[in-house]
């Protein structure tokens, strides 16, 4: 019997008022295409007030206001690898 390591759950919270759903969905697609076997889930969570946050489990790894905009897909993928 083999034991599988727990798979990473990623959540992307985006602002619906800012029309960032497509950006969020594209990032989710990029992650799922690259890490299809390593990820447990990628969840899109609608929000308001200019929010754009990416969390790995309970850890906030990207926040638009704090980190200055949106992550490049290359940067986001490197964060998953690390």
Residue ranges and their predicted role:
Residues 1-82:
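Domain-level signature for proteins that mediate thiol-based redox and metal-cofactor handling
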């Amino acid at each position: 019997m083999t034991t599988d390591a727990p798979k990473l759950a990623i959540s992307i919270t985006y602002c619906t008022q800012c029309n960032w759903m497509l950006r969020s969905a594209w990032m989710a697609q990029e992650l799922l295409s690259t890490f299809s076997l390593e990820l447990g889930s990628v969840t899109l969570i609608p929000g308001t007030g200019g929010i754009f946050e990416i969390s790995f489990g309970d850890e906030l790894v990207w926040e638009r206001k704090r980190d200055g905009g949106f992550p490049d897909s290359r940067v986001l993928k490197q964060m998953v690898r690390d």
